[in-house]
């Protein structure tokens, strides 16, 4: 079983590349932490110069569970798109709404409330989501990059 990781060079804003790792490689040793959040994807034999942007694949729920167990998901500074929990069109519309509202931040509103509040009918690819330039999209936290 494998997990696909989208990566961004630590000195650049744009998406650089993706890699696929076996789930046996996904563990706390992959990451550096600061203030409880993932700061850097840090495995030299793979891509030591990159941040983890987001992940997808058959084992997304398993990987999500592992991140939660590390108390990293809610505080990470990287983009994490929960593409199996929320359809991609939902994510796109939410990001567009936040952009229109001058990147308002909703710390006290959970993701489901935001999803229900807007009509969500657009489509987006993983690459487009990353290129929108947001540094955080997880558990109801939406923030401009």
Regions found by a protein language model. Name each.
Residues 64-67, 71, 95, 99, ...:
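Residue-level detector of alpha-helical secondary structure
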Residues 1-27, 143-145:
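Short, extreme N-terminal segment that most often corresponds to the first beta-strand
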Residues 111-145:
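Acidic, proline/glycine-rich low-complexity IDRs
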Residues 4, 12-13, 40, 45, ...:
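Context-gated lysine
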Residues 26-91:
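Structured domain cores in non-transmembrane regions
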Residues 28, 52-54, 80, 103-105, ...:
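Hydrophobic transmembrane signal anchors and adjacent membrane-proximal interface regions, especially
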Residues 80-124:
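Mature, soluble, non-transmembrane domains
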Residues 11-13, 21-23, 56, 90, ...:
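Intrinsic-disorder/low-complexity, polar/charged segments
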């Amino acid at each position: 079983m494998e997990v696909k990781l989208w990566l961004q060079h630590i000195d650049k804003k744009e998406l650089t590349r993706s890699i696929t790792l076996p789930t046996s490689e996904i563990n706390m040793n992959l990451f550096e932490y600061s203030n409880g959040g993932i700061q850097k994807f840090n495995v030299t034999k793979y891509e030591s110069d990159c941040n983890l942007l987001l992940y997808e694949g058959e084992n997304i729920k398993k990987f999500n569970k592992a991140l939660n167990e590390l108390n990293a998901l809610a505080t990470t500074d990287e983009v994490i798109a929960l593409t199996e929990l929320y359809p991609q069109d939902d994510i796109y519309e939410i990001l567009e709404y936040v952009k229109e509202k001058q990147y308002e931040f909703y710390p006290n509103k959970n993701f489901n409330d935001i999803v229900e509040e807007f009509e969500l009918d657009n489509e987006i690819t993983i690459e487009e989501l990353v290129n929108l330039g947001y540094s955080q999209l997880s558990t109801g936290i939406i923030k401009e990059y």
